[in-house]
C-alpha cells in the first residue's frame, strides 16, 4: 500500500533512558566494580516524512517495550521501529511504499541464529528466492511498480543529494559465543542479506547497519562450525 496510509511516527528519537532504567533495576550492565553500567546500543531510523513528524517515542515507551519483551510479544509489520518505515524513495515520498519490521530465525543442531530488520530503504524490495519484486517505487498513480535501478541510471549525473532519510537497520541474534573480531565478520556477512533483497543497496545515499548480539550459551569449540553455518 502507498505510504500515505501511515497514521503516526513512532520510531525516531527513541530515548535510551527507559531501557537503561529497566536494565539498572535488574542489575544488568557492564561491571565496573562499584556498580553495573547499563550500556544501551542505539541506532536511529529516519521516518519524519511519514505520518506526523511531531509524534515521537519517549523514555516511558522504551521502558514499556522492555517489559513487553519479557512476554515474547514481538510482532512483524508496522510496529516499533517499523511504524514509519518506507521503501522505494528514488522519486520522493509520493511514490514510495510503506514497509515495516521483519524477523527470521533458524536452528541447526544446538546453534540458533535470528535476525530482526527495520526496512527503511531507498531501493526496492525483492524476494531473494525468486527475484520477484514485493515492494518499492510506484508510478505517479500508485498502481504499478517502477524499477528504482533504472531511475539511478537515468539520473546518475545529478550532483544534488536528493536521496536522504534512508536507514535500514537490523540486529543478528545468536547463542554462539563469538569474539569481537568474529562479530565484525558476522555483521559483514549479514549485509549479504541486504544485497540479496534490496536494489539498489549500499549507495552513498543510504545507511545500512547490522549489529550482531551473541547470547553466548554455546561452547567455544563450536565457533568455527558456527561461522560456516551462519554463512548459509
Predicted features and spans:
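A structural signal for small-residue-enriched, beta-sheet-centric alpha/beta enzyme cores
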Residues: 1-14, 18-232
Amino acid at each position: 500500500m502507498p505510504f500515505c496510509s501511515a497514521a503516526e511516527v513512532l520510531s525516531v528519537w527513541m530515548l535510551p533512558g527507559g531501557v537503561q532504567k529497566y536494565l539498572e533495576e535488574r542489575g544488568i550492565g557492564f561491571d565496573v566494580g562499584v556498580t553495573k553500567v547499563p550500556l544501551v546500543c542505539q541506532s536511529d531510523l529516519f521516518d519524519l516524512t511519514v505520518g506526523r513528524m511531531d509524534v515521537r517515542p519517549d523514555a516511558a515507551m522504551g521502558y514499556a517495550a522492555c517489559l513487553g519483551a519479557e512476554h515474547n510479544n514481538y510482532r512483524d509489520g508496522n510496529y516499533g521501529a517499523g511504524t514509519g518505515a518506507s521503501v522505494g524513495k528514488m522519486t520522493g515520498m509520493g511514490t514510495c511504499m510503506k514497509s515495516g519490521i521483519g524477523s527470521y530465525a533458524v536452528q541447526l543442531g544446538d546453534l540458533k541464529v535470528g535476525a530482526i530488520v527495520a526496512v527503511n530503504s531507498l531501493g526496492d524490495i525483492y524476494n531473494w528466492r525468486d527475484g520477484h519484486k514485493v515492494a518499492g517505487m510506484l508510478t505517479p498513480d500508485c498502481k504499478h511498480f517502477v524499477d528504482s535501478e533504472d531511475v539511478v541510471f537515468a539520473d546518475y549525473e545529478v550532483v544534488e543529494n536528493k536521496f536522504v532519510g534512508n536507514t535500514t537497520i537490523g540486529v543478528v541474534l545468536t547463542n554462539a559465543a563469538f569474539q569481537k573480531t568474529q562479530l565484525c565478520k558476522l555483521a559483514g556477512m549479514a549485509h549479504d542479506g541486504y544485497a540479496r533483497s534490496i536494489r539498489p543497496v549500499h549507495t552513498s545515499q543510504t545507511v545500512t547497519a547490522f549489529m550482531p548480539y551473541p547470547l553466548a550459551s554455546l561452547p567455544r569449540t563450536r565457533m568455527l562450525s558456527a561461522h560456516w553455518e551462519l554463512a548459509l
